[in-house]
Amino acid sequence: MKKEFMKKIYKSITLVATILSLSSCGNDWLDRKPADGIPSEDAITNYNDALTARTGMYDGIQGNSNSTSYYGARMFYYGDVRAEDMQARTQGMRSSSCYEMRYTVDDAPNMWNIPYNVVRRANRLIQAINEKKVTDATEAQIGKIYSEALVVRALVHFDLVRIYGMPYTADNGASLGVPVILKPLERNDLPSRNTVAEVYTQVIRDLTDAINSGYLAKDKTQGYINEWAAKALLTRVYLTKGDNENALKVAEDIITNSPYKLWTNEEYVAAWSKISGVHSNEMLFEIAITGSTDWTDREGIAYLYNEDGYADVIATKKFLDLLNEDPKDVRLGVFLAPTTKDFQKLYGTNTVFLNKYPADGLSDLRYNNVPLLRLSEVYLNAAEAAAKLGNQNDKAVKYLDAIVKRANPANTVQGTIVTVDRVLLERRKELIGEGHRFFDAMRNNETIVRYTSKEDQGWQQALKEEVRSFNRDFYKTLLPIPQNEIDANPAMKDQQNIGY
C-alpha cells in the first residue's frame, strides 16, 4: 500500500490543473511571502528543508502574537461567541465584531488570508515531494511529512468552507464554497470559488489518502498530526457533510483502536493543564507551545478567555443556568468566578470565566497549548451519527453515556431513546469554549436564541434584533469574501456571498 501511495503522490500534481479555474491577473493573497522558514519556492531540496517547511506549516495553524487569525484565537471564538453559550464582554474589543455580527465587506474578521497562507505552505511541501526534490530520506520519512501536509490542507479547506460557504446539509453542497487550491499559486493564477460539494470531495480525498498511506504515526505525537488525529478530523467532516454512516464508522475505529482514552471524572478539571499527567490522554492533536518564540502571547485564546488576561470572552448566563441544573457536573469545575472588584460588580459570584486554557508550571497562561481535536468530541460525533441513523440507538446510548457519566457518575442515558437534540445539548456542555457550538447549530439547522427580551438577556449587551435569534438562513452566518480579494480577482467578481 505504501509503495502504491508513493507512486500516487508523484502523479497527483498532474491533476491540479483540472480543479483550478485560472485567469491572468494579480491576486492580493499572492503578495504574501511564504514566511515558513524557506526563503524561496525552490528552496525545499532536501530532508532538512522539508522539516523546516513542516515546522512553518504547523506554525501557520497556530499563528503568533501578530497573527492570530486562525487557531491562535479567532477560529475558537468565531465558533463560540456567534452562538448562545459564550459572549464578548462590552469591552471585548477582539471578539465583539463576531459576537455582534456587525461586519461588512470592508470590515469583517479576516479568516481568509492566514488560512490560505497555511494551504500555501502545505502545498509547497506536497509539490516538492511530488517533484522528487527530497531524496535524502527514507520513503517512510518522506511519506509521513507528505501525509501530514495533506491533512493540514484538508483541515484548512474544511474550515474555510464552513466559514464562507453554506452548510453542506442545506442544499447538498450545491452552493458556492471556497477556491480549492492544490498547488502554490503564481501571480497569474486566479481561482474561482468551487462548490461546497467540490470542497468536501477534496477534503475527504486528502484525508483518506493520508490515512490510507500508512505513513502517519499510530502512537501519540504531541504537536504533530498522527493517524488518529486525521481520522478524528475525518469523522468531523463526515458528520458535517451528513454522511452519518461513515462518521460513526470512523469514530468507532478511533474509540476502539487508538491509544487515547477519556479523562475520568476525577481527572477532568486538572487535566486541562498541559503539565498534568493525563492531559495527553484525550488530546488527539494540539499545537504545542514550548516557549516565547512560538507563542501567541497576549493575543492567544488562553489570554482572551481568562480573567488574568484580557477577559474578552465570558460564558453567558443562559449557559451557566443550563450547566448549573446539575450542581455535581464536574464541568462546573472549569469555570471560575471573578476575583477582582470590577468584575465582581458586573457578574457577582457567577462563574463566567472559562478555565480550559489554564496556566502551566511557568504560571503563565500564554504558554498553554492550542487544542484542535479531542477524544470527547469523537464520542459525541459517534453518538450524534448513531442517533441520526435511526437504527443504532444502542450505540447512541453507549457513546453519549460515556460523556454523561463522566460528567456525573450518578447520571445515565441508559434505557432511553437518544435523540439528536439530546446529543447536541451534551455537546454544548462538553465542548464549550472549543469553537464548536455555532457550527453544530448551522449543520443541524438549529435556531440560535441568545435572548428575546430583557428578562432573559442576562449580562449580554444590547444586540440588534436580527442577531438575537437566527438560523442559517440569516446571511451573516457566513462571512463576506474580503473585498480586496474580490477586487483583485476577476474570477470571483460575481461570487460574493448573498447579502453583502
Residue ranges: model-predicted function:
Residues M1-E4, K8, T18-N48, V203, ...:
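Bacterial Sec-dependent N-terminal signal peptides
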Residues C25-F76, W272, Y305, G309-Y310, ...:
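Membrane-proximal, proline-rich intrinsically disordered regions
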